[in-house]
């Protein structure tokens, strides 16, 4: 609905013409109530299943090397959730405390971050050399490692779990030895825009 400032104050504030003019001249204010923001949910990892059969079957079906799966599972960075049997990719802080979890359905296309996850800590591995490989999804990281297995633990990898650049920027700040960044994002609109933000 169009109109001038007086019309807006009359409509929005329920004022008469004279009252609206007073408001605009600074002689009266409109008290706006602040909308309550819901408090952020605490971050809780989904409960672990007693085994990882479905996650192994899913990832092996994606041609991920068994040793790569075992490597991340052994370090508590990958597990199967007890309720939905999703693959859960865990991102930890420098002290080994989980701060982020990304779920990938083992049946169907479900993907999502656990409520309360901090994007800066998404699924990653920090190696000793100076190269950081940046991906959109954790499965992309595992696929790349499977295709390029030579001395892979020496490199660093991060899955943005979307295209927010926060995780890559956090790693570069926390680990100054990382000097070379290789963007391995999808060639779609989201990947191209995410890559532009990282440049």
Name every feature range the model reports, one short phrase each.
Residues 8, 143-144, 193-197:
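Phosphate- and divalent-cation-binding pockets in alpha/beta enzyme and binding domains
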Residues 65-82:
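Short, basic/aromatic recognition patches
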Residues 61-68, 92-97:
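Secondary-structure boundary elements
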Residues 1-61:
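Non-catalytic accessory segments of DNA primases and related replication-initiation nucleases
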Residues 171-174, 193-199:
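Short, aromatic/basic amphipathic alpha-helical patches
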Residues 162-166, 185-195:
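Acidic, metal-coordinating catalytic cores used for nucleic-acid/nucleotide bond scission
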Residues 134, 178-190:
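Acidic beta-strand-to-loop metal/phosphate-binding motif
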């Amino acid at each position: 609905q169009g109109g001038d400032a007086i019309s807006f104050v009359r409509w929005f504030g329920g004022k008469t013409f004279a009252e609206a003019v007073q408001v605009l001249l600074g002689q009266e204010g409109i008290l706006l109530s602040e909308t309550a923001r819901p408090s952020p949910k605490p971050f809780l990892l989904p409960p672990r299943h007693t085994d990882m059969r479905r996650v192994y079957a899913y990832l092996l079906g994606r041609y991920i090397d068994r040793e790569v799966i075992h490597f991340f599972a052994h370090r508590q960075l990958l597990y199967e959730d007890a309720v939905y049997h999703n693959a859960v990719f865990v991102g930890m802080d420098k002290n080994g405390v989980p701060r982020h979890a990304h779920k990938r359905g083992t049946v169907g296309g479900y993907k999502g971050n656990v409520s309360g996850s901090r994007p800066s800590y998404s699924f990653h591995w920090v190696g000793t050399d100076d190269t950081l490989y940046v991906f959109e999804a954790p499965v992309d990281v595992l696929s790349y490692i499977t295709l390029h297995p030579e001395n892979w633990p020496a490199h660093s990898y991060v899955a943005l779990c979307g295209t927010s650049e926060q995780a890559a920027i956090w790693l570069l700040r926390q680990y100054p030895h990382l000097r070379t960044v290789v963007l391995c994002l999808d060639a779609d609109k989201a990947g191209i825009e995410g890559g532009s933000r990282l440049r």
